[in-house]
């Protein structure tokens, strides 16, 4: 075997239901190339970088001639805002970015205006040092800019009024400590109703005592200005949606009886004076929503709302998520203290992720009436435009739960987990983006993620491991996944200008690794930063063996895999010398890694040349990088599937296990590899977890990969050429006998109906969009496909 070592001389490169998800209106081009007439404004005499919640108001007159057909405004804030017109909430934002790309929303407020006097109001908050890690910030600020001269009357300046809220204080500051987990989504909200300026967003409110806003500076768009505090860019994703979501069931109460009609909003619940009660609500599936609680009376009462993915037993185990006996809630929470008046609505500043919500209520001398409680479900407006079914109905539940997981992990960026972090990691985002492409056909969040990571690059050339983020974290392996993500986009979308802009950054990323190649062994030497691979089986940080000491086969082979993808990109964009260099380097890395790490005795690829540890991960990358032949890859795959003594992949890396199965022409085994998802369903999970039990997060979209693989692996629908210009259909049915699938591609929809014909044959009914061709392949036989409907029997 060791004669496979190839010595290569490499050449050097020379070269509410508020429908907030409509299409975004156009921006006046002048505002994208010069300073805005409006000002960034703030509240005077306040610490601008500390925690604070602010109310901004502006009254303005419309002429009696009638309402305008359009009234476009551009809005942004630091940290965030919620915008009201004449008392109605119409928008929130901005989409998260960084100071170099601070996003603004463009909103047509004409439908909400009336002749005569109108009120434009905004709730703006800055979490200061308590902000989520995903929140970048400069200081508290707010801006509104009219799109044209007709809308300039609402521009932010000293004519706006502002009041700092005394009602808000942060709470739930010890979430991470109580949950014994990394949790960085920001604090909960404690709101004192007697200090809240109720109806402040309406025209009738008297703001005579409010301060005039303080002008900071004129906003500047990307590419312009000097001394910029924020550099503004148009929002590049749709506005997030909101829709009402009611609780279906009360699971437990303490010291009170609750009629089921309370949950429908038809029957208020009265909590007597001087009582302590608790009510456990079960959404019956994970959700991301703004809980809204409407109360009357109960002056001085204390209402604590605790949110959790699951309940915990005394050993802090979750167990079956449907079971609540001998378990208690533990998690993020908010507190509301009513002022005693009627129909007071509490809503937290930011959404909460939960399955269970517990109300712990303490009343004083005044009875408290709970008029209603529900959630306003929110998230990116992903729409299901694909379908999958088979003769195994259990796969439908996996498909359904995977889609739900993907939805909850999509907001103004991809979230790793909506409960614990709400951070966009490259390793997660690659899988999430493919799910989005295959199930919805929507590529906008994928494009934003690629750009976000592009903007995160460090002077060394690596992308940050998660971004946007106010804390530096670099995961070199995730920088490689960023390159893979661009390659994915290139294969699935025809957008040369978008892809081409990243080539210099791709080169810099890959050169960071090239500069760290051990010149003796021709494998990667010692690597800095956090070289995360997978959570289990390595160490507490999921770091690959050999990453810090040098000669990690896993990362070396992933680097080779990425070099081959980059070579395809550079060759496609007329950089043949660079492509040749990348291919030769990949070949050299593969050959030397195989030489040093292949163990003839057990037929496995070791994690390092010392051959002390072995993992599925090393074998996976050996197959994907081309370090082994097809026959060798099949032998290797059988060993890593059957040898339970070696490091096993978790849910994240099962995506790559499946990719390796397909490359080894063993995709039919995928169906048997679905047991981990079946096990999660048996545990009562309504979304897919971060890793096998015990898991921190119950909702992690890197574990939703079956929603991609049911279409790309079982149905076998893949791009045949870049841009999905042609289609390759290569089914891997496994033990299934019938499969139906439909998915969107740029040209339209691809549909397949597949039925086994005897033991080895297949009958395929395939529908391709107009002007689309492809190839159908089954057990080594190929049939050319044309546009329209065709029936194939093999």
Q: What is each of the regions a protein language model found here?
A:
Residues 290-309, 357-362, 426-456, 486-493, ...:
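Alpha-helical support elements that line or immediately flank enzyme active sites
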Residues 47-48, 72, 95-98, 108, ...:
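Alpha-helix capping and helix-loop boundary segments enriched in small/acidic/polar residues
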Residues 23-419, 428, 444-445, 449, ...:
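Extracellular/oxidizing-compartment recognition motifs
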Residues 1-26:
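Bacterial Sec-dependent N-terminal signal peptides
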């Amino acid at each position: 075997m060791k004669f496979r070592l190839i010595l290569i001389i490499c050449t050097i490169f020379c070269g509410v239901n508020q429908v907030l998800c409509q299409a975004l209106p156009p921006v006046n081009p002048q505002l994208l190339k010069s300073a805005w007439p409006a000002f960034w404004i703030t509240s005077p005499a306040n610490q601008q970088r500390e925690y604070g919640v602010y109310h901004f108001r502006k009254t303005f007159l419309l002429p009696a001639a009638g309402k305008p057909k359009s009234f476009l405004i551009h809005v942004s804030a630091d940290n965030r805002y919620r915008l009201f017109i004449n008392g109605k909430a119409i928008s929130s934002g901005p989409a998260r970015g960084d100071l170099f790309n601070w996003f603004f929303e463009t909103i047509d407020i004409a439908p909400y205006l009336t002749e005569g006097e109108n009120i434009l109001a905004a709730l703006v908050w800055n979490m200061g040092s308590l902000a989520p890690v995903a929140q970048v910030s400069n200081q508290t600020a707010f801006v509104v800019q009219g799109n044209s001269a007709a809308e300039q009357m609402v521009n932010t300046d000293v004519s706006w009024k502002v009041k700092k809220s005394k009602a808000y204080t942060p709470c739930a500051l010890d979430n991470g400590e109580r949950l014994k987990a990394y949790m960085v989504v920001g604090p909960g909200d404690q709101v004192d109703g007697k200090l809240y300026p109720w109806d402040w967003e309406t025209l009738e409110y008297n703001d005579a005592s409010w301060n005039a806003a303080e002008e900071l500076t004129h906003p500047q768009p990307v590419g312009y200005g000097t001394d910029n505090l924020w550099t503004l860019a148009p929002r590049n994703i749709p506005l997030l949606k909101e829709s009402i979501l009611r609780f279906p069931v009360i699971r437990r109460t303490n010291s009170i009886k609750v009629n089921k009609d309370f949950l429908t909003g038809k029957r208020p619940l009265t909590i007597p004076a001087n009582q302590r009660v608790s009510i456990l609500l079960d959404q019956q599936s994970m959700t991301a929503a703004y809980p809204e609680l409407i109360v009357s009376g109960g002056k001085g009462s204390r209402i604590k709302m605790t949110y959790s993915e699951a309940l915990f037993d005394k050993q802090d185990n979750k167990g079956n998520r449907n079971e609540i006996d001998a378990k208690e809630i533990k998690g993020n929470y908010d507190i509301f203290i009513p002022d005693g008046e009627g129909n007071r609505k509490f809503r937290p500043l930011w959404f909460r992720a939960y399955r269970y919500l517990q109300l712990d209520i303490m009343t004083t001398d005044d009875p408290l009436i709970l008029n209603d409680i529900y959630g306003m479900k929110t998230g990116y407006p992903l729409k299901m435009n694909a379908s999958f079914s088979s003769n195994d109905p259990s796969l439908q539940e996996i498909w359904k739960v995977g889609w739900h997981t993907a939805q909850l992990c999509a907001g103004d960026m991809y979230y790793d987990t909506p409960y614990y972090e709400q951070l966009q990691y490259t390793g997660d985002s690659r899988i999430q983006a493919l799910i989005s492409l295959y199930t919805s056909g929507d590529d906008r969040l994928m494009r934003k993620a690629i750009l976000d990571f592009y903007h995160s690059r460090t002077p060394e050339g690596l992308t940050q491991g998660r971004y946007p983020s106010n804390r530096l974290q670099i995961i070199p392996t995730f920088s490689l996944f960023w390159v893979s993500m661009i390659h994915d986009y290139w294969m699935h979308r025809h957008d040369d200008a978008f892809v081409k802009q990243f080539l210099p950054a791709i080169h810099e990323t890959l050169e960071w690794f090239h500069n760290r190649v051990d010149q003796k062994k021709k494998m990667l030497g010692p690597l800095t930063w956090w070289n995360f691979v997978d959570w289990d089986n390595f160490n507490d940080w999921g770091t690959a063996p050999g990453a810090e000491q040098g000669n990690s086969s896993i990362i070396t082979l992933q680097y080779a895999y990425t070099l081959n993808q980059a070579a395809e990109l550079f060759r496609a964009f007329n950089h043949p010398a660079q492509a040749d260099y990348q291919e030769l380097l990949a070949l050299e890395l593969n050959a030397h890694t195989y030489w040093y790490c292949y163990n003839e005795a057990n037929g496995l690829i070791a994690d390092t040349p010392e051959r002390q540890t072995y993992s599925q991960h090393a074998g996976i990358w050996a197959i994907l990088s081309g370090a082994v032949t097809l026959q060798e890859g099949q032998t290797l795959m059988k060993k890593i599937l059957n040898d339970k003594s070696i490091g096993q992949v978790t849910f994240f890396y099962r995506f790559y296990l499946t990719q390796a199965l397909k490359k080894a022409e063993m995709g039919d085994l995928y169906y048997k590899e679905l047991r981990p998802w079946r096990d999660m369903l048996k545990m009562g999970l309504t979304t897919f977890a971060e890793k096998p039990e015990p898991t921190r997060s119950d909702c992690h979209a890197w574990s939703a990969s079956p929603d991609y693989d049911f279409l790309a692996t079982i149905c076998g629908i893949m791009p045949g050429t870049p841009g999905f210009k042609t289609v390759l259909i290569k089914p891997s049915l496994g033990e299934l006998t019938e499969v139906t699938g439909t998915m969107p591609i740029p040209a339209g929809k691809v549909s397949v109906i597949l039925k086994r014909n005897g033991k080895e044959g297949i009958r395929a009914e395939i529908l391709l969009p107009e002007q689309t061709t492809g190839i159908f392949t089954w057990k080594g036989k190929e049939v050319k496909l044309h546009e329209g409907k065709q029936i194939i029997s093999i």
